[in-house]
């Protein structure tokens, strides 16, 4: 019985700690995390950098070496796709516009040293099909055809890439080429003037998360091209091709996770194995970047990167959830009645009570943690005071209403604790009665 009491007390304590303890992802060992997720792990393959962010706000939920400069390899193509989607949105291009393949395009598609698909001189390729070819089989030829649709000056296009990176706040990113393959691999068919043909592009996990978050929110149609494990291009024509995704975290792929719907992989001798995953399920909208997994000499790295990435993503999903913090309507704060004009919902740590700050006729949620960029912040809602708004405290204590919301949102944990406590009391009561019966028998 003593052992039971000790064990049960420990369980209850752990349950309570699990409810109130904030997540500290930066202190988690990635190798152990991946092992515990059931994957075979070689510590030498550990990612050099990784990040997971809330795609609504830019709040960082997981980070490891996020500002280390790395070669993104073919992930660079996401910026080219971004510029094309922006040109379409601005009316400069159209999604069904056709690009006629040149002799040079066909020659580039036949270069074995870089990733490609079959491009045939004289064939008209719709921009939408070229986008699929760029994002899934990672075709360098298709990427350059898209870049040339914006400008035939390859150097000016790279200049546009760098300008857009600066505009988005990608402060540690520099492009030397449009596709992620160094220009010297193109056998003279591609060489942006003024850019080093032997140097790879440079970026960081943070910067790629900024780019992915922006393209996910601004141009969600891109995810329609990346959300399937198998993709067909030029379907119904003599040039139809079928491609299996390299993003093995997509549902239906080798390490598929429900909710993953993009975005791009990349690998090179300089940068090893990398990928960006986008996730959207149960209103959890996330961007994950994993860089520098394994070594180029072992091509299994294209699978291994997803074991680490999946373990990290699942860790975040276990510790965070999308919740309604404050519903639209009238609320009572310490006797002051105010009305919010909309419901406030967001991604928050499980088991953590969000604090609110009332200031300048707004309710601001206060959450710990960094953001991708300095101008990003936690969401807020406008309020209309029905009484005493000016007297509301700027730093309110945890209120009765907050606790009530918290209890509802953590009903299962509280049910376990309350139920367990009742069971514990019943066991003690039963033991007490048993002792009395034993004493009576001795008499």
Where do the PLM segments sit?
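Short amphipathic alpha-helical segments
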Residues: 12, 147, 302
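Active-site-adjacent loops and short helices of periplasmic peptidoglycan-processing enzymes
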Residues: 25-205, 216-219
